[in-house]
From Swiss-Prot:
Family per similarity comment: Belongs to the histone H2B family.
Name of the encoding gene: H2Bv1
Biased composition (Low complexity): 114-123
Annotated SUPFAM superfamilies: Histone-fold (SSF47113)
GO molecular function: DNA binding; protein heterodimerization activity; structural constituent of chromatin
Protein's name according to its UniProt entry: Histone H2B.v1
């Protein structure tokens, strides 16, 4: 029996869903994504994060260290991904950590006073301009701490992980949106995610064992019928 005046305590939206919608706006602003598709991608990316972090913490244990570094996450990413995906994921992680270190070395300067006379340009180089991350490293750090590993976690390692997760999501979303556009739709459905993974060799090697609800089956064409 439902009581009047009481609101449901069930949460239908997760933080990952917000990040996924922000990514799809960057990739293809004309496309939207179904709620079920968001749930599928959230589950995929959580499993990937757990696999990467389990391998990274295992490397920390083997090296007798107490702090998880970006290098440990990088090695784990290379072990958990394949081919061009691995190469681009490592590249994105390195760029994110470089920007993070540059921001620490060159903090933003306060604006000059209006009464100050114009002076020559400063000799201090400006940090590289980069887009702000979609997935904040603080959110990932909170989730990784819930894995109950008794190790310290550096901020650079979470920046690296954030870049890798964003790259993997962007790859799947880009292929899924292309499939939806080819089918003359603007809504990304689970079928589009399934075909995006099934038709890509590297994504299929990583997620081919995953069952996607509502994804259907891969179409088979008999070459003798043509």
């Amino acid at each position: 029996m439902r009581h009047r005046g009481r609101r449901s305590t069930q949460h239908t939206h997760v933080r990952e869903g917000i990040y996924i919608k922000k990514l799809i706006k960057q990739i293809n602003p004309a496309c939207r994504i179904q709620v079920k598709s968001v749930q599928i991608l959230t589950s995929l990316i959580r499993d990937t994060t757990i696999s990467i972090m389990n391998e990274a913490f295992h490397l920390v244990q083997l090296s007798n260290k107490r702090t998880l570094s970006a290098r440990d996450v990088q090695t784990s990413v290379r072990l958990c991904t394949v081919g061009e995906i691995s190469r681009h994921a490592v590249s994105e992680g390195v760029k994110r950590v470089t920007n993070f270190n540059s921001a620490k070395q060159y903090p933003p300067q306060p604006p000059p006073a209006k009464t100050a006379t114009p002076s020559s340009p400063s000799s201090i180089p400006a940090p590289p301009i980069s887009h702000p991350p979609i997935i904040p490293h603080s959110y990932l750090k909170t989730k990784v701490k819930q894995m109950n590993y008794n190790y310290r976690i550096s901020n650079s390692s979470m920046h690296y992980l954030s870049a890798v997760i964003e790259y993997l999501l962007s790859e799947i979303l880009e292929l899924s949106s292309n499939g939806a556009v080819s089918a003359k739709r603007t809504l990304i459905q689970p079928r589009d995610i399934f075909l995006a993974i099934a038709n890509d060799i590297e994504l299929h090697s990583m997620y081919g064992h995953v069952i996607i609800p509502g994804g259907g089956t891969k179409p088979l064409f008999n070459s003798l019928s043509f």
